[in-house]
Amino acid sequence: LKLGVGTQSIGHSMMPSIITSEYLTDAPYFNLRVFSPIFNYNCNITQLSRKTHLYTHRIETILFKKIQFSFMEGVLPYGNFDLRMINPFSIYHGYGIFNEISNECSSFFGIKVNVTPIKYLRLYFLYAQNEHTMSSEEDKSIPEGSGFQLGLESYIPSKKGYFHIGCEFYYANPYLF
């Protein structure tokens, strides 16, 4: 259980993370984390302004000691603090809050994958989405908001330390966030 003010980053990358970057500084937050060697659950409430709170939860798992997979869901209602969002086992999209608050609510979805195929090499993929218009929706005025990061990095040992080599590709359409 953590209560504090500071940065919160999801996904270690060379450029700022497309999911949540360390450049969001001085934001008060409440964090509940439950973890084991193969499973991690994280519930987070970040206060962005007096009437704006970002509610997120994340589930992470490690498979075969080489693959880490994370799924994150979040909602950003513009209004007063909402007690319904404190339930750590809630699925935010199931509350119908989007119909209740109308256009004053944003959703968020993120995926993080880390793969370590061999020692000293890491491949990673980060995906973020905050808007998706279904083909069945009548109003097509809201544009898609998504982006991803793909990279690899290696720390090669030497006698006096490590050489850090990496490459990263970053794409975000203009309407992400």
Residue ranges and their predicted role:
Residues 4:
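Small/polar (Gly/Ser/Thr/Ala-rich) solvent-exposed segments
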Residues 9, 21-177:
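Signature for the C-terminal beta-barrel architecture of outer-membrane proteins
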Residues 12:
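Secretory-pathway/luminal and periplasmic proteins that interact with or process carbohydrate-rich
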Residues 15-21:
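"Short basic amphipathic alpha-helical interaction patches in structured regions
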